[in-house]
Amino acid sequence: MIKKTLLSFTILANCTFLFAAEVDHYSVPAKLIPNSSALVYEKVQNYLQMALNEANVLSSCNEDILYKKMRLYFNNHTKGKLTQDVIYDEGFPSVRIKLEESIFQDWSIYNGFLLGREKAKKSALALGPIMKIDNQVLGTDKLEHFFGSGFLYFKRHHKNGTDLLKVLKRGAFYEKTILGGNFLATGVFSYADLAANFNGMRFWNHVLQKDDDVLGAEENLGPYVSCEQGQWVQVKEINLAEYLDDSFDESKNCSKFATSRGYEKYTSRLKLIEGLRGVDFNCLSSTENNSYLTEKYQSRLRNGDPIHHWIINQNGHEQVSYFNEF
């Protein structure tokens, strides 16, 4: 029994660090977060061209090779050059918040081991930087989810034909376990991560645009790449702003927590920050914002659920339910 528990913990620890752990959307005002759009788009353009060139050397419009080469640059921090640049380059325009000065400063190993342990204070992955792209504030971890988990969603639904509801359920299961929302991981169940995963799936589908967008054909943004005379060529520039919205922002698309004590610590610290900054961060306070997001993601799944049911938190901060959350 002890061996099984240790094995489960080891698996959780290794899988969780495939992604930067958490972010703090509260401690620094949005106006103080530098806009990194120009640099991000320059890197996106350069890395896409590098991927196309490398794919063209190896084949004549082979899709699997194209995706393989693109994922060398667009992936999580263990594999993707873009996310590595964003997370590890201290000169990259973003804001880095020390764990001991963040909303998670009261966290203990009992609230979320990977975020509460002493080593987390020295880890670049414990608390990801906050950045701004086209005036949308997001954590750098959301780029990892967008490109990394987004590709897995894309592969399951668009490549393998798995029903979208099953794909979203699987994503929620992973978020509850190996990707955060478990007290052996960070203890934070992030709806914003799920929103980034979903929109990343849309992005990867748009690369070649072989299927209509899951939100409707009117949302088709691709193709970005096309096969011409046996070579992959870029036919449209990638505009990340067309995917980013407030569902990526954890101060507006609230997270839930693995333990009741973690929930209490988080919300208590949030009240202190609100008092210091004179801001109400209640993610349910903006009816206009909620209406916009629920309308955008209103497409129905086969069981009748709107997509927003799986990626937008409409209940506010609370302890996550492991069996009845959805």
State each model region's role.
Residues M1-I2:
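N-terminal secretory signal peptides that target proteins for export/translocation
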Residues T5-N14:
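Sec-dependent N-terminal signal peptides
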Residues A20-R170, G180-L194, F198-F326:
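Intrinsically disordered, low-complexity, mixed-charge
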